[in-house]
């Protein structure tokens, strides 16, 4: 799946990577590096604190917007080390986001809540979306899922 869009042979890829697992690990690391870069751009950019909160929590570079939600299940089955790396990446690198959340509470943009609980809710939601095939099978795009999640978490479900 990687060789064809790059117009190179599988043999060429395997001269650089000793296995498909090594290739996938590198791809995961690259994807999350891009996500962290995207978050840094959001934090450094203009916009209200509320806009930054919404954007940074669900940051997703354009090239990953079409992410297939069914991939995590396949990784768990075929490449558990890669699946573990994805989970580890989801759980790490939260410092800038946590600082933004703390700022939002301090400035009254967000009511005081347990930030570790909120972080766990976000991480668990993302992991659940990646593991459950039902949303992808019903045609829902991953970015739309993230946008709905953050809307519910930040705005709640009760009418205002």
Regions found by a protein language model. Give the residues of each.
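All-alpha amphipathic helical-bundle segments outside canonical DNA-binding/catalytic cores
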Residues: 50-51, 85-89, 105-123, 140-148
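Helix-turn-helix
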Residues: 1-22, 26
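Short secondary-structure transition hinges
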Residues: 61-99, 105, 109
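C-terminal peripheral helix-coil segments that are non-catalytic and often amphipathic
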Residues: 55, 62, 95, 99-107, ...
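Secondary-structure edge/capping motif, primarily at the C-terminal ends of alpha-helices
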Residues: 42, 71-75, 129, 133-136
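Amphipathic, non-transmembrane alpha-helical scaffold segments
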Residues: 24, 28, 32, 83-94, ...
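Hydrophobic alpha-helical connector segments
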Residues: 26, 30, 37-66, 118-122
């Amino acid at each position: 799946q990687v060789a064809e869009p790059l117009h190179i042979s599988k043999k060429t890829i395997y001269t650089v990577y000793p296995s498909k697992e090594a290739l996938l690990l590198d791809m995961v690391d690259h994807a999350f590096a891009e996500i962290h870069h995207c978050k840094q751009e959001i934090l450094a950019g203009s916009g209200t604190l509320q806009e930054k909160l919404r954007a940074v929590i669900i940051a997703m570079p354009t090239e990953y917007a079409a992410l297939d939600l069914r991939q995590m299940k396949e990784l768990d089955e075929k490449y558990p080390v890669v699946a573990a790396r994805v989970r580890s990446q989801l759980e790490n690198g939260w410092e800038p986001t946590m600082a933004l959340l703390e700022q939002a509470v301090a400035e009254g943009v967000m009511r005081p809540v347990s930030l570790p609980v909120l972080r766990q809710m976000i991480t668990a939601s993302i992991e659940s979306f990646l593991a459950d095939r039902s949303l992808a099978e019903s045609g829902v795009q991953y970015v739309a899922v993230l946008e709905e999640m953050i809307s519910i978490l930040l705005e709640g479900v009760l009418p205002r």
